[in-house]
Amino acid sequence: MLKLFLIFIFISNIIFADGIEQKVKEIIKNQFGNNVQIDFKKYKIPPDLKREIENKAKQKFFSENVIIWLIKEKDSLLAVAIMDNVYGKAQPITFITFLDENGKILSNHIVKYREEHGGAVANFNWNKQFIGKDEKSNFNKVDAISGATISVNSINKGVYKLVLLYKTLMRTEAWK
């Protein structure tokens, strides 16, 4: 038990280094207000599901884990947010996708952009194009950004992966 606790603390420190946890909480409060309950957990993606989603999205997951945030108000689920990383040109890009209970995207945010170029993918207006998309949407039509081709493609495929993951998770209670 102590070993599991220490592993959780170690992984949490890695994931939430550089103020990432605080930035996510700030994004949640800005979107849903101050009166929401926020719970998060690390979710290990089962290998078969991971492979299936990676093949469909044509992009590998950054790791075998994602962080799932449950945003509730008075025990009513408002949204589920899934945080992951994708590779930019040379550095990871940390992003979070908010979904409603039906799997439609409510919003997408870049939590941490580490590259020297291509930071325009963090622009709120660019990320608005994901709102309303679900697993049946055409993710091939996203706005290009000059100088950010790799980041645009990575974020686009990454968001699609999380939508596919959530659609599968909706059918099970194991992740909650």
Feature locations, PLM:
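Intrinsically disordered terminal and processing segments
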Residues: 2-5, 13-94, 101-176
